[in-house]
């Protein structure tokens, strides 16, 4: 099994961590969840804008028009898909002050699971494609996606457990969204393999960079602010950028990057 596929599977499996936290009642503080989302956004923004997009533009045979065009395509494509999908957000189910009937919780959890699954599928493709092109960047994206997936698993499993009383059902429902990400990676592995040209890979990387920027700005940072409105998610973003930038410098200095 390829390393990029393993990274994608591990990132998707992080959803189960959140699911177990949801059914065990060991809910992390809102401050920690918000910081982790900001941290993930910082990692994605730095990798996308400082590594992936420049690498795609520098690829042999890649034109600036195609490179920037694919970046904008990924950016706008994410926003378009995000607007079309059923929209129930994790924070809607994580607020203890909201009292919902079991039927209402079930319905909201179904919509949330569906929406998250559809969002996670392209994230799996993005993780695999990035790791296939540059393993160093793949580790960073996998870490960011994993941090993003933990609150999602928590948000689905907690309400389902409250509605059904079944820990197994709650973990299963939460796991579906993580499996969607893994399926995305498997699909990319089966279709792309090693038979893809450098220009096509660079174009895909540029589009993935656009998707990651849109995800960070439109989903992760606003979600962090809603989960913990008393603190600025920018601290997590800056910390994520700093840690990722420092780690990239260390890897490149060691000759790994």
Curated annotation (Swiss-Prot):
Q: Supply the InterPro entries for this chain.
A: ZIP, Zn_transptr_ZupT
Positions binding Zn(2+) in this chain are 123, 148, 152
Recite the UniProt keywords alphabetically.
Cell inner membrane, Cell membrane, Ion transport, Iron, Membrane, Metal-binding, Transmembrane, Transmembrane helix, Transport, Zinc, Zinc transport
- Mind telling me which residue stretches traverse the membrane in this protein? 5-25, 32-52, 61-81, 109-129, 137-157, 171-191, 195-215, 236-256
List residues binding Fe(2+): 120, 123, 149, 152, 181
Please give the chief subcellular localization of this protein.
membrane
Offer a single GO CC term for the protein: plasma membrane
**Recorded GO MF terms:** metal ion binding; zinc ion transmembrane transporter activity
Q: Does the keyword Transmembrane helix apply?
A: yes
Q: Where in the cell is it found?
A: Cell inner membrane
Protein's membrane topology: Multi-pass membrane protein
Q: Highest taxon of the source?
A: Bacteria
Reactions catalysed = Zn(2+)(in) = Zn(2+)(out)
Is Membrane set as a keyword in this record?
yes
For this chain, the family text in UniProt reads: Belongs to the ZIP transporter (TC 2.A.5) family. ZupT subfamily.
Its function, per the record, reads: Mediates zinc uptake. May also transport other divalent cations.
Q: What is this protein called?
A: Zinc transporter ZupT
What gene is this protein a product of? Answer: zupT
